[in-house]
Swiss-Prot record:
Annotated protein name in UniProt: Envelope glycoprotein
Highest taxon of the lineage: Viruses
Listed Pfam families: TLV_coat (PF00429)
Organism expressing this protein natively: Friend murine leukemia virus (FrMLV)
Keywords tagged on the record: Disulfide bond, Fusion of virus membrane with host cell membrane, Fusion of virus membrane with host membrane, Glycoprotein, Host cell membrane, Host membrane, Host-virus interaction, Membrane, Metal-binding, Viral attachment to host cell, Viral envelope protein, Viral penetration into host cytoplasm, Virion, Virus entry into host cell, Zinc
Glycosylated residues (UniProt): 12, 168, 266, 268, 273, 275, 277, 279, 302, 304, 309, 334, 341, 374, 410
Amino acid sequence: AAPGSSPHQVYNITWEVTNGDRETVWAISGNHPLWTWWPVLTPDLCMLALHGPPHWGLEYQAPYSSPPGPPCCSGSGGSSPGCSRDCNEPLTSLTPRCNTAWNRLKLDQVTHKSSEGFYVCPGSHRPREAKSCGGPDSFYCASWGCETTGRAYWKPSSSWDYITVDNNLTTNQAVQVCKDNKWCNPLAIQFTNAGRQVTSWITGHYWGLRLYVSGQDPGLTFGIRLKYQNLGPRVPIGPNPVLADQLSFPLPNPLPKPAKSPPVSNSTPTMISPSPTPTQPPPAGTGDRLLNLVQGAYQALNLTNPDKTQECWLCLVSGPPYYEGVAVLGTYSNHTSAPTNCSVASQHKLTLSEVTGRGLCIGTVPKTHQALCNTTLKTNKGSYYLVAPAGTTWACNTGLTPCLSATVLNRTTDYCVLVELWPRVTYHPPSYVYSQFEKSYRHKR
């Protein structure tokens, strides 16, 4: 998770695939907690060649450009305007490139052919002993044995690399897309178990890809990185809203002015009574609300222990933690996609040591905290969210959160209890308060 946040907090996450110049050429976004969403990335092979090496024919094409070059002809008559070749002619694997529909068809043939294909070599995250693999100039594939994935007859693989790369379309599917003059060589990049364990995707990782053809194998480099954005409301920098919200003491109502004596008249007087003007009570300010909290605590104490309220002091604490959690039972809601409040960071801080009572627990609760649990639920596998009912929140060993990610619960040792948050009000007998005042008035002789 982001520093200081709950691992269950939902962010807008974007996985980006970059070219050799580290420009974004393909991206996919979704709302998920960090390190729980590992989609299949499907950029086209030719997208990686945008602004790339001259071999691919796209060195002057910017990222997100449309497929260049003339389309294929529909037949020997050449009915498509501006077409260059009949795409039904026999293909050769010579010059598989990206600059025309005809050459993209050749590239499709190379990447799917059992005797040809492509292979991928990792960049700087490879083991230190792989010194002979070279750098980006050799596409990290300077010698055989550097490849960790790809689609080639020897089936390159690895137990430690972060991704696997394959074709995302069959050759028959790709042929039709190529004839429609579109990008037609999409890849399927999947994260391995090793790749799902690392959290360095924000800075990015890089690979090289080379075609396996006769002669020198042409290649390119590409990268994968993650970006995330907080979806919660931004807190403005400015005056303390609590101070601004406090209301001043109401001024006393002015005394009514004495009525003037009416002039003497021979006419019959008519009694006119003024209509009362309704007055709206002023809205409660922060001070009123805080006082109401203390009054509520007093009423609860007076009902349960009336002898304690004959003379006492009830105080709101002036230092953290300002709240206590009371474990409760409740019915949470289950959502397949993250609701809006899952992206809001909690404004309160609380640890499980400040929770009392017995309530609903979720996860693998250790023996040290099982006293908080009246009922303990296990989560099923899957990607879904458990939202606390209104007026409650989840108190977890990682902090407070309005909703839980089942993915996070299942891949970590996180455990949570459903709680209500109550302000901390301390009780002091009069002797304690008087002693504090006496200390402040004593002076050393």
